[in-house]
């Protein structure tokens, strides 16, 4: 059985090595939507794979909320740029990978699976979609991890 939960946050980033000059050289923001699809067996006692409140409260909400109104920075970006952002912004997330929708989907997938593993409920992340826009998203699946 599959269940899906939608989360939202607002964040800014620069996507180094992008084709678009706007994305490559300018801080810009998105209204991100993150869809998390979980796979598991229906518990006969509850009639659910996992209560949606528990999906939110198992740490996924806190993980994604840490990105809300933050500037997302690639750790390999220019050191002066990183220091300037840290100096002028209270909410900064430094990523190991270039902050593309694809990389965010992979990172979220791994982090969410780690949170779920702590619950010992045999629930797996089937896929994670990171929407940067209404028309564009990246999706990580089990074989991408």
Feature roles, as predicted:
Residues 1-145:
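Charge-rich, low-complexity N-terminal segments
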């Amino acid at each position: 059985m599959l269940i899906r939960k939608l989360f939202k946050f607002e964040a800014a980033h620069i996507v180094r090595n992008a084709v678009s000059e706007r994305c490559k050289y300018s801080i810009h923001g998105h209204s991100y939507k993150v869809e998390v699809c979980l796979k598991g067996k229906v518990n006969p006692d509850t009639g659910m794979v996992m209560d949606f409140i528990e999906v939110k409260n198992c740490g996924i909400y806190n993980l994604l909320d840490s990105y809300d109104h933050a500037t997302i920075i690639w750790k390999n970006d220019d050191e002066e740029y990183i220091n300037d952002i840290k100096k002028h912004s209270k909410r900064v997330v430094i990523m190991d990978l270039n902050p593309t929708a694809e990389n965010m989907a992979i990172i979220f997938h791994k982090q969410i699976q780690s949170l779920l593993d702590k619950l010992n409920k045999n629930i797996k992340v089937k896929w994670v979609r990171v929407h940067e826009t209404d028309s564009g998203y990246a999706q990580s699946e089990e074989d991408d991890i």
